[in-house]
């Protein structure tokens, strides 16, 4: 996976709480098991007025011209709730998002995000309120998300955030479960050499 140390990106405000995984990527688009191709269906029922996805909803925030190319999603509490599907972070990253900022996340979505190099940043309700006001008052604003120093730079203010040290290490070094295993390849090989033949 790609390393994540710091990201500067355009912020799009999705002013909704309890955004569930079926809203993020509706079930009819879950036929594939590869990670690509889901971005076009992200928030399908909100982005489009028709089932075929040919008529964009001009009122939906992702369809606003000044948010084209956004890579940081600002949302409300309990983001990613609902059924467990890894396709949700797949759709977000395939669309181009690198970071989701919210007061809270559903546990399974939170874990799946790290596994797919999508950084979920938890800030307080009050801090998220401030960020919504900032974005609403200044369309096209960029935030700097610094994972190494665990801080979001938004305008003239900095917002520190907490993150598990192991997950932080994995994202900074671009490590998934396979990458973590390969870090210990020499030790694994040495261990296998010392095992009885019938165990190999």
UniProtKB/Swiss-Prot annotation:
Pathway: Amino-acid biosynthesis; L-leucine biosynthesis; L-leucine from 3-methyl-2-oxobutanoate: step 2/4. One of its GO terms (molecular function) is 3-isopropylmalate dehydratase activity. It catalyses: (2R,3S)-3-isopropylmalate = (2S)-2-isopropylmalate. It comes from the Bacteria. Keywords: Amino-acid biosynthesis, Branched-chain amino acid biosynthesis, Leucine biosynthesis, Lyase. GO terms for cellular component: 3-isopropylmalate dehydratase complex. Gene3D superfamilies: Aconitase, domain 4. Its EC number is 4.2.1.33. SUPFAM superfamilies: LeuD/IlvD-like. GO terms for biological process: L-leucine biosynthetic process. Heterodimer of LeuC and LeuD. Catalyzes the isomerization between 2-isopropylmalate and 3-isopropylmalate, via the formation of 2-isopropylmaleate. PANTHER family: 3-ISOPROPYLMALATE DEHYDRATASE SMALL SUBUNIT (PTHR43345:SF5), 3-ISOPROPYLMALATE DEHYDRATASE SMALL SUBUNIT 2-RELATED-RELATED (PTHR43345). Belongs to the LeuD family. LeuD type 1 subfamily. This is 3-isopropylmalate dehydratase small subunit. It comes from Pectobacterium carotovorum subsp. carotovorum (strain PC1).
């Amino acid at each position: 996976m790609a390393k994540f140390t710091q990201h500067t990106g355009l912020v799009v405000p999705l002013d909704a709480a309890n955004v569930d995984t079926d809203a993020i990527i509706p079930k009819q688009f879950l036929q594939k098991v590869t990670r690509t191709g889901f971005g076009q269906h992200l928030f399908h029922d909100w982005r489009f007025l028709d089932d075929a996805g040919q008529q964009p909803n001009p009122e939906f925030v992702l369809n606003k011209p000044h948010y084209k190319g956004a890579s940081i999603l600002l949302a409300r509490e309990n983001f990613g709730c609902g059924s467990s599907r890894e396709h949700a972070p797949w759709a977000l990253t395939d669309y181009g998002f690198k970071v989701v900022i919210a007061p809270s996340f559903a546990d399974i979505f939170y874990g799946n995000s790290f596994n797919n190099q999508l950084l979920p940043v938890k800030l307080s309700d009050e801090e998220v309120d401030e960020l919504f006001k900032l974005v609403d008052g200044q369309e096209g604003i960029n935030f700097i998300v610094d994972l190494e120093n665990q801080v979001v730079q938004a305008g003239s203010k900095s917002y520190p955030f907490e993150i598990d040290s192991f997950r932080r290490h994995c994202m900074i070094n671009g490590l998934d479960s396979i990458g973590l295993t390969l870090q210990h390849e020499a030790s694994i090989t040495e261990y296998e050499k010392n095992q009885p033949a019938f165990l190999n």
